[in-house]
């Protein structure tokens, strides 16, 4: 049975003000799916028509919505209040402390208080696992690795030897931290592997999505700063440094020794060349190809391949469909003929 709240109580927990009847609610749902006894939210005005038709008991919103026949939980930031409300109705699962008989914990490993180690999880020689850490089945903490308190490793997360993970970190299924960087020296006989002898450091309050891979440094440290959030299926190469509170969407690839600043936003499927810098506060649109260093002082938003100011890119893509006609017009004006295959 889920949590139930009077709307007045829920309002206090999410930083909102109740306007309307103080009904009891027991869940949260999308604006077009919510029913009686549930809360929904409106942060994008384009969904106001659906909000007017909702069957929800209450809407989290900036201001009352004319025509909506329900209560309102009013707040300056509906999206943040929505995030808090979800946490009230669906609190994180707390697994019972203890070590499964099917787990493997090396005698020299150190486990903190109230740690959960699930079946087939492995804690290797000299590893340190902090208080209240959760290791789901199949998680692997390598030799000498460190895991900070209140961190969660979902199934099949792999921390290689010597990796350091901070506090309150959430690592989703299948992510790999500390595998070898892609380093090879060409020789006449082929490629000789360069041993990757550095490590990876993950700061506090980081979240890393499923099947994301972060390579250990060749020398030194590959670093992800505090509060940064990485989506699924991201590749972070050796010696990359990512600042704090940066967000990176799925399928991004970051080549070796790139430097990403604080509060950067990177859209999905973007690619960043090695040894470049992306400054604090820069925003990259989806599929952006970054081949040179970028700074918010030049322009905050960048898109395209190669990366260019977003407004320039918008003008360019607007012109692209017109290029065949423009080409024909220029050809006629010059009195020439279109090249073979032209129209």
Ranges and model annotations:
Residues 1-102, 163, 168, 174-175, ...:
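Terminal amphipathic alpha-helical/low-complexity segments used for targeting or macromolecular assembly
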Residues 41, 98-309:
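Structural signal for interior beta-strand "rungs" in well-ordered beta-sheet cores
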